Amino acid sequence: MKFATTLVTGLVSLASLASARITGITLPTKIGVNEVFNVTIKSENYIQSIADIAFAFGVIQPQYADAGSLGMYLVGESFLGPTFSNQISDFIVPVGPIPDNVPKGETLFNAALFSLLGSRFAPTTFIWNATVTLQNTTDYSQTITSTIPLTFDYYPG
């Protein structure tokens, strides 16, 4: 009985050390202007603690896109904080609406995540993007996932 109690206590303390990181985004390939739509935030187990602070979302026509920018139109933001930081399961955030003055057709959707990494809380920004089509209504029947971020790190020396 003592072994079982020790084992359970050890597993509980290991579970409290569980950490996760955000690994990408999934969103509809066809997004309606003037509509709020859902973006799934992908996550997985990770070896260290990460304090995920907030997401910002933007769109831009591909021919005007610059690496590292959100685009010409800021279309949403989401504070994550302790509720969604270090969460091992995927979760959904509402985004939008994308204004109707954004040209319909092929558009680059960008998501920037500001996080603090490790025991020294090193600030880092991750940016994921996906090419989507802007149209009259959102269609959830097809989605696109982006899992390779552009990363901007600052590590104190």
Identify the residue ranges that each predicted region occupies:
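Proline-anchored loop/turn motifs at beta-strand termini and strand-loop-strand connectors
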Residues: 28, 60-62, 94-100
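Internal, hydrophobic beta-strand segments that form the core of beta-sheet-rich folds
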Residues: 90-136
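Beta-strand signatures of extracellular beta-sandwich domains
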Residues: 54-58
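Short aromatic-acidic-glycine turn motif
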Residues: 59-72
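Extracytoplasmic/periplasmic copper-protein system
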Residues: 121-157
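A beta-strand/beta-hairpin structural motif
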Residues: 72-101
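Fungal secretory targeting signals
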Residues: 1-24, 157
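N-terminal edge beta-strand
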Residues: 17-42, 47, 152
